[in-house]
UniProtKB/Swiss-Prot annotation:
This is tRNA sulfurtransferase. Transmembrane segments: none annotated. The lineage of its organism: Bacteria, Pseudomonadati, Pseudomonadota, Gammaproteobacteria, Aeromonadales. Keywords: ATP-binding, Cytoplasm, Disulfide bond, Nucleotide-binding, Redox-active center, RNA-binding, Thiamine biosynthesis, Transferase, tRNA-binding. The keyword Cytoplasm applies. Its main location: cytoplasm. Residues 61-165 form the THUMP domain. It comes from Aeromonas salmonicida (strain A449). Gene3D superfamilies: 3.30.2130.30, HUPs (3.40.50.620), Rhodanese-like domain (3.40.250.10). The keyword Nucleotide-binding applies.
Length: 482
């Protein structure tokens, strides 16, 4: 199988040297991601495209899913690549691919040509289109809004017959821009904000301020791992977890109630700035949106930003909440956010919407900054690729098994699409299906006398979900790895 990768348009208008550098980086990124599951993946670089090929047709569906989620790809074409002798040979090859699919359909032929030939692109379109109309049971040629558009590309003596066109995610290739540190809470906003910078070519590292115990951290790790594995797996990134409960306790004791929200955000920015300094990251990313909550007025954001010299990037600053939720649904983080509790909102009962810097600084004078320094010094840094292994070592009581006992039930927690593509069949046993994003609410309704073995393809999500359920007090759960 072969695919032609078309570059994001903003790449094509760069200078020659920048374009070559971006294209070469995209080539490496595609190769890195595809070889996670197919070592035979090949990626060849041309001036205006990349050509991806593999002999392993069994990975076709994974190629389609993966290529659609790599930054820098505007769209990609499934192609049949061959040589040709003349116009009639091109027609015959095109009819072999498209003939049956044109039955009863209106169509047109669009051709793109590079190199020296004894025919023009228009002549190629007319010859092949006329031949298909004459020799196939079509509903006729329609140049505007046809049922099917047959796309051909001729490059010197090579013919590319395009059988399907798929949209990519656009943006710049990963690591063509500088790194950023995203303050990830697990909610709708921070996940979408992180995605925006992945798409723009930044390596997005994650900083998590834990306000809700192990369950909160497990939930946010799931979001970070999902974003990385889905859209950014070509490069390693770091996940930083900071226990912020001591900071919250100090704020509750020492800071005026109305100023608590702004002071908390300033403490988070201070801590994130130190983490960014440690990893030499020049910018922070948040999901803040002007006016969405009390701490996100322009006055308050200005006061919050004063505590760090890092650039604080807010890609959602003017987005409406319904648009953020819609984008979260599109990229796949909605289900995580819907089950993630909001911890920051309980801090202040009557929050200020126009913080005065001098008043905030006076309140912070009562704060013991040794507490902030301590929680940052004790921060835990994790290569996001190791999340599954780290969680397994962290909580020893989660049992993994490949053998089923009589009272054990297999619980497939994959999404419906993953399940349908690769069904789990265990001879003589039924398999229950509850997607991971519904497990937190649905698990308590299952019969408690049975033990449930959670299953997913790689074992990472099932391990994280088992940890979450253990934290909630459910002991009748294991991980199934056949």
């Amino acid at each position: 199988m072969k695919f032609i990768i078309k570059l994001f348009p903003e790449i094509t208008i760069k200078s020659k040297s920048v374009r070559q550098r971006f294209t070469k980086m995209l080539q490496g990124n595609i190769r890195n991601v595809l070889r996670r599951f197919d070592e035979d993946a090949r990626v060849r670089m041309d001036w205006d495209k990349l050509v991806v090929s593999s002999r392993n047709d069994q990975f076709h569906a994974q190629y389609l899913e993966t290529l659609a989620c790599i930054p820098g790809i505007q769209y990609f074409l499934e192609v049949k690549l061959s040589n040709f002798t003349d116009l009639h040979d091109i027609f015959e090859q095109t009819r072999a691919v498209w003939g049956d699919r044109l039955k009863g359909k209106t169509f047109c032929v669009r051709a793109r040509r590079v190199g020296k030939h004894d025919f023009s692109s228009l002549e190629l379109e007319r010859y092949v289109g006329g031949g298909l109309n004459q020799h196939c049971e079509t509903a006729g040629v329609r140049l505007k809004k046809p049922d099917i558009q047959v796309n051909l590309e001729v490059e010197n003596d090579e013919l590319y017959i395009i059988s399907a066109v798929h949209h990519g995610m656009g943006g710049f290739p990963m690591a063509t821009q500088e790194d950023v540190l995203s303050l990830l809470s697990g909610g709708f906003d921070s996940g979408v904000a992180s995605y925006q910078f992945i798409k723009r070519g930044c390596r997005v590292h994650y900083c998590f301020f834990n306000l809700g115990g192990a369950a909160h951290e497990i939930g946010v790790k799931q979001v970070a791992y999902y974003l990385w594995s889905k859209f950014g797996a070509s490069h390693k990134v770091r996940f930083t977890a900071i226990d912020f409960e001591p900071v919250v306790a100090e704020i509750l004791e020492k800071v005026d109630n109305g100023q608590m929200g702004v002071v908390l955000k300033r403490m988070m920015m201070r801590a994130a700035g130190q983490v960014a300094d440690y990893f030499q990251i020049p910018a922070l990313v948040t999901g803040e949106c002007v006016g969405q909550v009390s701490s996100q007025t322009l006055t308050n954001l200005n006061v919050i930003d004063r505590v760090t010299d890092k650039v604080i990037l807010r890609p959602l600053i003017t987005w409406d909440k319904p648009d953020i939720i819609s984008e979260a649904r599109r990229i796949g983080t909605l289900e995580f956010a819907e089950t993630m509790p909001e911890y920051c909102g309980v801090i202040s009962k009557k929050p200020t919407i126009k913080a005065v810097l001098s008043n905030i600084e006076a309140e912070e004078a009562n704060f013991d900054f040794a507490i902030l320094d301590k929680v940052v010094s004790e921060a835990r840094y994790l290569d996001i690729r190791r999340i599954g292994e780290e969680t397994a070592a962290e909580v020893q009581e989660i049992e993994t098994t490949e053998v089923l006992a009589a009272d054990e039930v297999i619980l497939d927690i994959r999404s419906a699409d993953e399940r349908d593509e690769k069904p789990l069949v265990v001879e003589g046993r039924d398999v229950l299906h509850i997607p991971f994003f519904k497990l937190a609410t649905a698990f308590g309704d299952l019969p408690k006398e049975q033990t449930y073995l959670l299953y997913c393809d790689r074992g990472v999500m099932s391990k994280l979900q088992a940890l979450y359920l253990k934290e909630k007090g459910f002991d009748n759960v294991k991980v199934y790895r056949p």
